[in-house]
Amino acid sequence: MQFQLPTPHMTFDIALDDGAKIRMRRHGRADGVRLLLSHGNGFAADAYFPYWQHLLPQFDVLVFDFRNHGQNTPAVPSHHTYEQLVRDLERVTQEVTARLGKKPTAGIFHSMSGRTAMKHAIEVGWRWDALVLFDPPNMPPPGHPIYDVMAAFEKRLTAWAKARRRRFNTVEELAEDYRQSRAAARWVPGAHDLMARSVLRRSPDGDGYELVCDPENEATIYAQAMALNLWPAASAFGGPVKLIGCDPHMKGSTTGPANQALGAEGGYDYSFVADTGHLLQIEKPEECAKLTVEFLARCGLA
């Protein structure tokens, strides 16, 4: 099976404050509630199509990659920090409203983009009618029962990203790496090829392919998690937030228990998807879409 993404109804670029650009793609129903949707560190929004395809019949879906990811040309210098990602998200929300008009809007964000959306909403301002956060890998404060586990997890990811292979002769090489990865074993059929197509670009020197998000940038984001101080209560936001985690009972899960703890301690509307890991939207896309729409309906948005 191979996923074929639909042609967007509209594409446009958003210029960021340092000259970098983000490519926006508009899918779904133009008359529907607006959804802004993005991805996790080192991934790309197109690769989440197994999930967001289920939202297209009802919603106006704007899909985008954060800087140095996906369809965007890598920035030089990269300015690949959470502080910059927060500024970028503010620019995205402003420009989308300026170009397409104001209407009910929800944000749907996974992992890195989820943390960015949380930080943006608390430190910059609430720009949404609702937020849906998939498994943001937040660090609890020092002394918390799961702090050491999460700290070790982020350090392992940082080391892994620094050593990650950057270049590939073909897209299929990376797709096969994903198929052989234990972490990607539960992805739906076709997702491994889609992910490889989404995170690679042709090498500027014409020799094969390379990761759009280079390993140094990916490692930087993992390392910055240690100092974000992001463990907010749901009441810290200016509107309704849904927290959806991976299965906290899965063997070896770290982000699952972390989100379960955040949900309980922070008073969130929290759910988890059984038998999933961190890429839950690609492992059980229909279940994730169902939870999304049910929450949006409770908010009067579906």
Question: Where do the model's predicted regions map?
Answer:
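Active-site loop/oxyanion-hole signature of alpha/beta-hydrolase fold enzymes
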Residues: 17, 66-108, 290
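N-terminal cap/lid segment of alpha/beta-hydrolase-fold proteins
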Residues: 2-21
